[in-house]
Structure formats: structure tokens, C-alpha cells
Amino acid sequence: MQSNGQIYGLYIHWRLTYLLAMQLFFWKDFLDLIFPRNCPLCKQALFEFEACLCTVCKGLLPRANFHLRPFDNELTSKLQGLIPVHRVIAFLHFSKNGRSQNLLHQLKYKNQPEIGEELGRMYGSTLDLNGFSGLWDVVVAVPLHPRKKARRGYNQSERFGRGLSKSLGIPYSELLVRRKFTDTQTNKSRLERLTNVENVFELQPGVPIQELRVLLVDDILTTGATLCAAATALLEGGAKLVDLATIAAGGR
């Protein structure tokens, strides 16, 4: 039997734990009042169980089905002749002024890295349900130049990759570095984009990648120039295969 002293000690411990929990709940409610958690699309307040996007906006996302034909779709056709193409997939259809562009803009320019992780987790769950989990050994993101990453504070593609990594249960690794600072790809022709990123990426020194099956991720696939340049560095470094996945691609 426990002595009165032990019982009293347990009571004090429980009481302190309870008071601490109440304080944490108070401060959380206070912070939610001052800095409310809102859905980045509809701006409505999020419920406790909603991580980043509200349930309604999740249901309205322009989801693509490239993963149903990963070897033969409009994305693989776009990259034919640039690299040895395996699977090329994307979570969302991109449309100008649409939800996908809105999310990408807020992810990249409005300091909302959590959007990338949430989209990665969502897409990872979709891929897991469709039997993709055992296809890759590692998830790798197209890196930003250190100067650009320091200015933004994070790499949006890395956040997407880490979300995918968690849902698929495979490691995330920074296998690539961007050794040259390049101009933005926006408003460049396809040839100009290819030239702009030529020999931009290289492997992290001393990191073995021989025979690895890599899922290379980026935020958006337009001409595919950046992804192809990064994939080439991985393949030349010894990767067994490189599949490509992006948050958004194509048009609608």
C-alpha cells in the first residue's frame, strides 16, 4: 500500500501537470485569437483537426491523375529526349489564377512553408494507396541556391518532399547542391530555360548514391528544364533511376 506521503506526492504531481496543461491551452487560445489559423485559400478559420487547408478547399483542389499512367502521360511526353524518362507525376493541375497557382504563390512568396508539407503528405497518401510506397529508396528535392534559400528562409520543394517522405515512409535526403545562381526561369523560352540551368547541379560531396532509386521533387513542372538538369546530375552520379514528382503541372 502507498503511504500518505506517496499519495500526497502523486496528487501534487497531478495537480501541477493539470495546471501546466491549462496554461498551455490558455496561451494556445490566446495566440489563436491574436494570430488566427486560417485556410490559405478561403481564409476561413481552421478547426483543430485541420492542419493547413480546410476540408472544403481540400475537396476542391484540382487533383491530377498522372499517377494512374506514370510511364505514359503528357508529362513524360514533354520530357522525351531530354533524360531517360521513367515515372513523371504531379499532384495538381496548374491553372493560371486558379487554386493551384494561389497555393504555390503563398507557399513561395508569403512565408507559408507548411503548405508544401501538407500537400506532400496528401499526395504521399494518394501514392501509398496506389501502390507506390516501395518504388523508391529516397526522396530528393531540387535545391535552391544558398543565397535564394537564405532570402526566402526555406526551400518550398524541400517542404513538399519532406511531406511525401513522411507519408510514404522513406527517407528524405539532400543529395544535390546548386552551385550556380541562375536567373528566374519565368518568361524564358524552352531553349533559354535549358541553357539557364545547364551544369547548375552537382552531388553533395562524399554522399554515395550508387544504385539508389530516387524520387526527385520540385514545385512545378513547366518545360521540365530544371528537373531534367537535376535528374541528369543524379543519374551521372550513379543513381539507378530517377522518377519525377511535382506539386503542380500542365494546364487546365
Model-flagged regions — what are they?
Residues 1-218, 222-252:
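Glycine-rich phosphate/pyrophosphate-handling loop used in enzymes and phosphotransfer proteins
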